[in-house]
Amino acid sequence: MISPASIAAAFAKNPDLLGKKDINHTCSELGLTRKSIGFPGDDAAAIPDKNGWQLVAMEGFMNEFVAAEPWFAGWCAVMVNHSDILAMGGRATGLTNAVWAPNRNTASEILRGMSEASKAYRIPIVGGHTNFN
């Protein structure tokens, strides 16, 4: 049988869990604490309202990934944020986009991936920002 100390030691060295320390650094740099209006988190921000909580998620992607797979990056933009909201016990009610692309064709592929995922997950895209460079 594996001892509790061995399990704890394995968790303490897990690179995925160690990466969560980045949240503390980000919150510190932004001056966010547990007393801030929104609760800093990993999957999404939790903002209290009169009916419970609003969950807000956002994801960024590496430029190399977007350049190599623009349609899939668009799909993942929806899927990852949907997953993050679900991970916190919520239900996604809408999406916004922030797309910077080198040209209209690349942007179209990203937006097509987002649109198809939006329909597949039944989450409407309600706004956002697009910029071609």
Which residue stretches match the model-derived regions?
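Extreme N-terminal cap/leader segments of soluble proteins
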Residues: 1-68, 88, 97, 108, ...
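Alpha-helical scaffold segments that flank or form the walls of functional sites
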Residues: 72-88
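Amphipathic alpha-helical segments in well-structured domains
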Residues: 78, 111-114
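Short glycine-rich or small-residue beta-strand-to-loop segments that form or flank ligand, phosphate
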Residues: 95-102
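Short glycine/threonine-rich loop-to-helix capping motif typified by GTGT followed
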Residues: 102-111
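Short, intrinsically disordered, charge-balanced linker/junction segments flanking boundaries
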Residues: 131-133
